[in-house]
Design a protein with these regions (language model features):
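Bacterial N-terminal signal peptides
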Residues: 10-21
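Initiator methionine at the very start of the polypeptide chain
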Residues: 1-2, 27
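Bacterial N-terminal signal peptides that target proteins for export
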Residues: 2-11
Length: 637
């Protein structure tokens, strides 16, 4: 195991904090939080100092061009409701979410007896009540009077009868929230569109939006440029769209007293971002949003629990000397109830949102790599360095002056490869390496690691005959899914005192058709049994081809006490050479295929098709299908 470098960095970070700050994270005074700016004048003065410093450096090197290139690359690459409401939403959910009660923006949602699908710049509804399977309504996802040019409409969430479509506009330079109303019969009505200032939120793995009760929660980065004529033109703001709307109509939603910082010196030469969490209440007649922002380094991974957003920041990749000397990383805890954020200095970077777990034991657990890159754009698909598990008490978060102690990092084995998958299942953290967005290579031997995150036990190496492209819970146990370069394997793992493989199902000449977490779904029907659904394609297809190609089928398996058996697959029959008149979002960045379970009915969404299967004994057979493509169906608007 090559762990020493990681531990050295963690020790150096902790020692530096002790030298410069009285106390340590283990002794953090309760109630200490990050410091907010006192006024807009204080922020303006900071921008002036940054601009003067960068101009000084410009005389020593080509710093101005370097900053502008870095900022451009950064922009391109880079309060819970009552438990009853959360439980009701979870029961109606058809989405494979990380946290129960925290819905995630996706391409298909359920509203009673109606499925709502977001695809290629349009919203569609399909009725599934009783034995129905019938298209009902369609609407442009960008709403009336809004140009779709340069916009991507990626995610959707539903609260009550309100549908929120989340997009990003390069033309208008910000996140868009399109609000629609849906009737009990599935009819759609456009309501209004709002804009939030932000840089592109896209991540190949993470989702920009969450829904907790009626609260719509966003994480968005804002990369700062001290040379802008009006620095406040880059700060969080919000406006309602109308024809002829101007930039002057943006209303600030994060005053200076809601913008926070640590004692860590920030250098615009290396990049600075406002890591912004915005909460909007969809239950109110008119949308109002409030933001909290933390000023920090540009690299980021974020994770949403039931009550907080965690944002892990890392220095820009140009600052390798600084990274070698110290951590260059921090993790911020931003409460959703509007309370002041807290922070902790840390080392390394998580892989993606699944690297985090806020446990019921009041601890935060995070899998990190010493040379991680965050999860902006495709950064999560390629990271490097040693592995460690960070485990800290939530009480150790304070004003950001303290570091996580070196003993809070547990060095872990380092598998070979860059496309890391990780997941917390029961009392274990599991991780391994697969093909990611690349074509899977021929694999005869691989492994997945499992470690109890709450104690000092060693990591268990579990041998596999395939790579690790997906790790998913099967109740208290897990299934590891991956390719050997030709075939697709589903390996069930019992997470007992000593984790062990229980069974393996192999689908010949196949690969998974979706890499995102929402592509998989497990529907339990008891503690030890349930149904697995996953889109598949022919063996050897690279994961990146999911952007423009539908899955060939959705495969369904039965789990019975970790024995996996095939029930059948529902196949796709796409229309040949059909032109759907796409005007926006004409690449499936979030995929296009999902397994769907509604009550006792089983569906496969594949592009513009929904296919229903019926289980008879141990066989799943197709009973009906429908196309909701705008080419073949005339839908009422």
């Amino acid at each position: 195991m090559r762990n020493n470098n990681f531990v050295r960095v963690a020790v150096a970070t902790a020692v530096a904090a002790i030298i410069f700050v009285t106390g340590s994270a283990a002794q953090a005074a309760p109630g200490k939080t990050l410091q907010a700016f006192a006024s807009e004048r204080e922020i303006s003065d900071l921008f002036k100092r940054w601009a003067e410093e960068t101009r000084r450096r410009e005389g020593e090197s080509r710093s101005m061009q370097g900053f502008q290139d870095s900022a451009a690359m950064g922009a391109l690459s880079s309060a819970a409701q009552p438990a009853a409401k959360a439980a009701e939403a979870a029961a109606d959910s058809i989405t494979n979410v990380q946290h129960a009660g925290v819905d995630e923006g996706g391409i298909v949602k359920r509203h009673g007896d109606t499925l709502v699908i977001l695809r290629r710049g349009r919203l569609f509804t399909v009725k599934v009540g009783g034995d129905e399977l019938a298209p009902v309504s369609v609407a442009d996802a960008f709403g009336s009077g809004v140009s779709p040019h340069g916009a991507w409409y990626d995610e959707m969430l539903i609260s009550g009868s309100t549908i929120a479509v989340i997009g990003y506009s390069y033309e208008r330079g910000g996140t868009e929230i399109g609000l629609f109303e849906i009737s009990d019969s599935g009819r759609l009505r456009y309501r209004e569109t709002y804009h939030l200032r932000s840089n592109d939120y896209y991540s190949s793995r993470n989702y920009a939006s969450r829904l907790i009760g009626s609260k719509l929660v966003f994480y968005t980065p804002l990369y700062l440029n001290p040379f802008a004529g009006d620095p406040w033109g880059s700060f969080p703001a919000f406006r309602r769209w109308r024809p002829g709307v101007t930039a002057a109509e943006f209303k600030p939603i994060a005053p200076a007293t809601r913008i926070y910082r640590t004692d860590e010196p920030l250098d615009p030469w290396q990049g600075v971002a406002l890591h912004t969490v915005t909460v909007c209440d969809l239950a109110k007649p008119q949308l109002n949003c409030e933001s909290t922002a933390v000023m920090g380094a540009p690299g980021r991974v974020f994770y949403v629990s039931g009550g907080s957003v965690y944002v892990w920041t890392t220095q820009g990749r140009r600052n390798r000397a600084a990274l070698a000397a110290a951590s260059g990383s921090a993790v911020f805890r931003i409460p959703l109830d509007g309370a002041a954020p807290t922070a902790l200095k840390v080392a390394g970077s998580p892989i993606d949102q699944f690297s985090f777990l806020e446990g019921a034991d009041n601890h935060l657990n995070v899998l990190v790599r010493s040379d991680g890159r965050g999860d902006g754009m495709w950064a999560a698909e390629r990271n490097a360095g040693d592995f460690a598990l960070l485990r800290v008490s939530l009480d150790s978060f304070s004003d950001g002056k303290d570091s996580a102690p070196a003993e809070s990092y547990k060095a872990l084995p380092r598998p070979s490869g860059h496309a890391v998958q990780n997941r917390y299942v029961g009392s274990y953290l599991m991780y391994g390496v697969g093909a990611g967005w690349n074509r899977a290579q021929r694999t005869l031997y691989s492994q997945v690691y499992a470690v109890r995150y709450a104690d000092d036990s060693k990591a268990h190496e579990i041998p596999l005959a395939h790579g690790v492209d997906r790790i998913e819970p099967l109740g208290a146990n897990a299934v590891v899914i991956g390719s050997d370069g030709r075939d697709l394997h589903f390996t069930s793992v019992r997470l007992a005192a000593t984790p062990s493989v229980q069974d393996r199902y192999t689908r010949l000449n196949a690969a998974q058709g979706e890499t995102r977490s929402h592509g998989f779904y497990y529907k339990p029907d008891s503690d030890n049994a349930g149904f697995v659904g996953l889109p598949i394609v022919g063996g050897g297809r690279a994961g990146s081809r999911q952007l423009r190609e539908n899955s060939a089928a959705v495969l369904f398996l039965r789990n019975q006490s970790l024995r996996l058996t095939e029930l059948g697959a529902l196949d796709s029959r796409p229309e040949a050479n059909a032109n759907d008149g796409c005007r926006a979002s004409c690449v499936d960045w979030y995929g296009n295929s999902r397994p769907i379970f509604v009550n006792n009915r089983v569906f496969a969404l594949m592009g513009y098709e929904i296919v229903e299967g019926r289980l008879s004994g141990n066989q799943l057979a197709e009973v009906q299908r429908v196309s909701f493509s705008p080419v073949t169906v005339s839908l009422a608007r």
